[in-house]
Amino acid sequence: MNFEIQAHRGARGIGPRNTLESFRRALAAGVTNLELDVGLSRDGVVIVSHERAATRLECTGAHVGKLWKDLELDQIRTLERGTGDRFTTLDEVLQLVQPHGVGLVIEAKVDPLRPNETAPAAELAQRIVDTVEARGLVSRCVVQSFDWRVIVESRWLCPELRTTALATQSTVRPGSAWTAGLPVRSRNPFNGELVALAFLAGAHAIGPHHHGVNPKLIREAHAAAMRVLPWTVNRRWTMHALIDLGVDGIVTDRPGRLRDVLAVRDFELPLPVADEFARAA
């Protein structure tokens, strides 16, 4: 498998995050995967957004301040984003990538500490799986989350669907509600326990913050046939350092910058899908 260039939130460094415009720009830059965040509307549509609600940072309209789970898609479509884009759906992004061979990394935004602010983890996982299966794109999609209940549920619903266990020092620690009931014993799981826990959750890869990546973590992950995909990396020297450590891919807001780093190291690069926005990368 080639080194992964994951365009974070549709490469938010070169376009408005989590919009069809940013996804098109990332495709034009040449990436292996688009990464995006999703939640669930009241009528069961998987929508693309990093937030739990319509916020003034992202949009204006009558429904600002309301949770996605309390709004239907028609109401969400009335929100103005100021970019010419409306909020998009997972299915629309799947349609965008379907002809091009690019993968999709779908982050389920749920929070076990705020269960009343999003749809239940199991329901969101079910809707994601249903949407991906309906497009016949299971082999090109990955589901990931900091809330590992999504990982467990996704694997149960669709065993062939790949998953990534996202992790930070605050979500993987003793007493954590984020690890799907798996007990964390170490106060520094990035030095030994993280890989075993993610493996038990059924993950195919781990997604640590790049500050948590270390040689032991990578050795243990590779010994378990798991990939290491750190986020979110935008500085060239950090990209070089992580590649030297042996990571399997990088999540970045600047895919063009990562391509430059990989090119000088003679990595095989994915072909751009189009060149309309390539200069912006």
Which residue ranges define each predicted feature?
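Phosphate-group recognition and catalysis centered on beta-loop-alpha active-site segments
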Residues: 1-281
